[in-house]
Amino acid sequence: MQSSPHDSYGEEIDRPVVVRASEYPAGYSSDHHWHARGQLVYACDGVVKVTTEQGAWIVPQHRAVWIPAKIEHQIESAGAFSMRSLYIQDNPKFKPVSYTHLRAHET
C-alpha cells in the first residue's frame, strides 16, 4: 500500500458514502492505488477487471465487487466501460456484515 499512490477522491466530503460516476475508453488501465475508504465498484456497461495482491476479479456488466479500505488495487478493461463507485468511510458501522468469496456459477 505505501509504495502506490493514494487516491483521495471524496475524502474531503463529510459524508459516510460518496458516489463517483466514471467512463473509460477501451484499453484503460489505472495505476496501482488505494483509498482510505472502502470502494464498491459497479460495472454499468462493459466488463471491468479488478486486481489486488490477493487475486483478480472479473466484474461483468450489472455486477459489483467490494474493495476494502487501504487495499492496493488496479482497475482495467480491454473494452470501453462505464463504472460507478461508492466510497464508504472506513468505520465498523459502515462495513458489510458478511460477504462470500466469488465462486463460479452456472445458470
Regions found by a protein language model. Give the residues of each.
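Jelly-roll (double-stranded beta-helix
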Residues: 29-32, 81, 98-99
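Short acidic-glycine-tyrosine-enriched beta hairpin
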Residues: 54-66
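Conserved small/polar residues in nucleotide/adenosyl-binding loops
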Residues: 100-107
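A generic beta-sheet turn/junction motif
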Residues: 36, 52-54, 79-81
